[in-house]
UniProtKB/Swiss-Prot annotation:
CDD domains: PHD1_DPF2_like (cd15691), PHD2_d4 (cd15530). It comes from Xenopus laevis (African clawed frog). Belongs to the requiem/DPF family. A zinc finger (C2H2-type) spans 205-228. This is Zinc finger protein ubi-d4 A. Keywords: Apoptosis, Cytoplasm, Metal-binding, Nucleus, Repeat, Transcription, Transcription regulation, Zinc, Zinc-finger. Residues 97-107, 123-137, 251-262 have a biased composition (Basic and acidic residues). A zinc finger (PHD-type) spans 269-329, 326-376.
Length: 388
C-alpha cells in the first residue's frame, strides 16, 4: 500500500508527508505530556504520566524466545514537590519580644522621649486599636520574587505532582494506613449521623415528655394515654394545692390536647364523624342511634356508619374501644406496623399478625375472630359463621 501511494504521489512528496505526520504526532505527544493528567475526549479515560513511550535508541535485544526488542524498565519514584518561598512577614514573631521595642513600633513611645512620660501621656490600652485593614500601607503588594523562584512556582510538573502522587499513582503503605484510619473514623461518625437521621425520618412523632418516637400519631396517643396520663393527673392534683399554676406544655400533638375524663378516657364528641349527626338522628338513616366513642381521641360514630354488627356493638361496650386511627395491638399495646394489624369481626379489637400464637404470615380470607371471642361466643363466632 505504501509503495502504491509513493508511486502515485512521488517519492519526495511521500517523504514530506511522513515527516509532517511525525512532527505533528511529536507536538501532540509533547503537548499532552505538559498537561498530564488529562481527560481524553475520545476514550473518556484520564491519561496520567507514564513511561511507555520509548525512542529507538532505547531498544535492546530480546531476552525471550520470539521477542524482538526489550526496553529498560524504570522504577517508580515519588517526585519532590517544590514549595513556593514563604513571605517573611507571615513568619511568627519571637516568643519574648522587647516590650519597649513593641511600644515604639506601635507609636506609644516616641523615639526621642522618655518611656515614663510617653506612658503617662498615652491613651489607655482599650483605646488603642489596630490600624484599619483598608489603609494603603496594609495593602502593599508582596515583594517581587526572583526569576528562579517564579520559575519554580510556575513549573507545571510541580502542580502535576499532587495529582500524580495521590490520584493516579500508588502511595506508600505508611500513608495509606493513615488515610484508612482517618476514613474509618469519619465513616463511623457519618454512619451514626445517618442512622439517627433515618430513625427520625421513620418515626417522626416524638413524645415531648420522655422523647420516645413513634411512626404514627395513634401510637404516640396510646403511649401518652397509658404512660404519662396517670402521672399528669397526679401532678395536676398536687399543683392545685400550690399557689403557682403549672407551666403549660405548648407543643403537644392534637391527640394529647383532647380532654380526658376522671377515669382517663377521652371525653366523647356529641356528633358522628361520618354523617355529622348526633345521638338523636343519623343523617344517613334519619333515625336515632347511639354513638360509639373512641377512648383515646373522643371521636364518635354511629354503629351503622361504622358498619358494626349487633354482636360487635355489644362487644365494644365491654372494653375501651379505639377508632381506626388510634387502634393498637391488644397483645403488645403498640400501634407500630399498622399494616400488620388484624381486626376481629366480633369485637373490633386489633392484633398484630406476628403477635398471634401461632403467628400469621398473611391475613385470612373472610371473617376472623380473636381468641377472646372464640372463648366467649364458641360456635357463634364470625369465623364459624363464615365457614358454614
Amino acid at each position: 500500500m505504501a509503495a502504491a501511494v509513493e508511486k502515485i504521489l512521488g517519492e519526495q512528496y511521500y517523504k514530506d508527508a511522513m515527516e509532517q505526520c511525525h512532527n505533528y504526532n511529536a507536538r501532540l505527544c509533547a503537548e499532552r505530556s505538559v498537561r498530564l493528567p488529562f481527560l481524553d475526549s475520545q476514550t473518556r479515560v484520564a491519561q496520567s504520566n507514564c513511561y511507555i513511550w520509548m525512542e529507538k535508541r532505547h531498544r535492546g535485544p530480546g531476552s525471550a524466545p520470539g521477542q524482538l526488542y526489550t526496553y529498560p524498565s524504570r522504577r517508580w519514584r515519588k517526585k519532590r514537590r517544590a514549595h513556593p518561598p514563604e513571605d517573611p512577614r507571615l513568619s511568627f514573631p519571637s516568643l519574648k519580644p522587647d516590650p519597649e521595642q513593641m511600644l515604639k513600633k506601635e507609636g506609644v513611645i516616641p523615639p526621642d522621649g522618655s518611656s515614663l512620660e510617653a506612658l503617662l501621656r498615652s491613651d489607655p490600652i482599650e483605646k488603642r486599636i489596630m490600624p484599619d485593614s483598608r489603609d494603603d500601607d496594609s495593602l502593599t503588594e508582596f515583594p517581587p520574587l526572583s526569576r528562579s523562584a517564579r520559575k519554580r512556582i510556575l513549573e507545571p510538573d510541580d502542580f502535576l505532582d499532587d495529582l500524580d502522587d495521590e490520584d493516579y499513582e500508588e502511595d506508600t503503605p505508611k500513608k495509606r494506613g493513615k488515610g484508612k484510619a482517618k476514613g474509618k473514623g469519619i465513616g463511623s461518625a457519618r454512619k451514626k449521623l445517618d442512622a439517627a437521621a433515618l430513625d427520625d425520618r421513620d418515626k417522626p412523632y416524638a413524645c415531648d415528655i420522655c422523647g420516645k418516637r413513634y411512626k404514627n400519631r395513634p401510637g404516640l396517643s396510646y403511649h401518652y394515654a397509658h404512660s404519662h396520663l396517670v402521672d399528669e393527673e397526679g401532678a395536676g392534683a398536687e399543683d392545685k394545692e400550690d399557689s403557682q399554676p403549672p407551666t403549660p406544655i405548648m407543643h403537644r400533638p392534637e391527640e394529647q390536647k383532647s380532654k380526658k375524663g376522671p377515669d382517663g378516657i377521652a371525653l366523647p364528641n356529641n356528633y358522628c364523624d361520618f354523617c355529622l349527626g348526633d345521638s338523636k338522628i343519623n343523617k344517613k338513616t334519619n333515625q336515632s342511634e347511639e354513638l360509639v366513642s373512641c377512648s383515646d381521641c373522643g371521636r364518635s360514630g354511629h354503629p351503622s356508619c361504622l358498619q358494626f354488627t349487633a354482636v360487635m356493638m355489644a362487644a365494644v361496650k365491654t372494653y375501651r374501644w379505639q377508632c381506626i386511627e388510634c387502634k393498637c395491638c391488644n397483645i403488645c399495646g403498640t400501634s407500630e406496623n399498622d399494616d400488620q394489624l388484624l381486626f376481629c369481626d366480633d369485637c373490633d379489637r386489633g392484633y398484630h399478625m406476628y403477635c398471634l400464637v401461632p403467628p400469621v404470615a398473611e391475613p385470612p380470607e373472610g371473617s376472623w375472630s380473636c381468641h377472646l371471642c372464640l372463648d366467649l361466643l364458641k360456635d357463634k363466632a364470625s369465623i364459624y359463621q363464615n365457614q358454614s
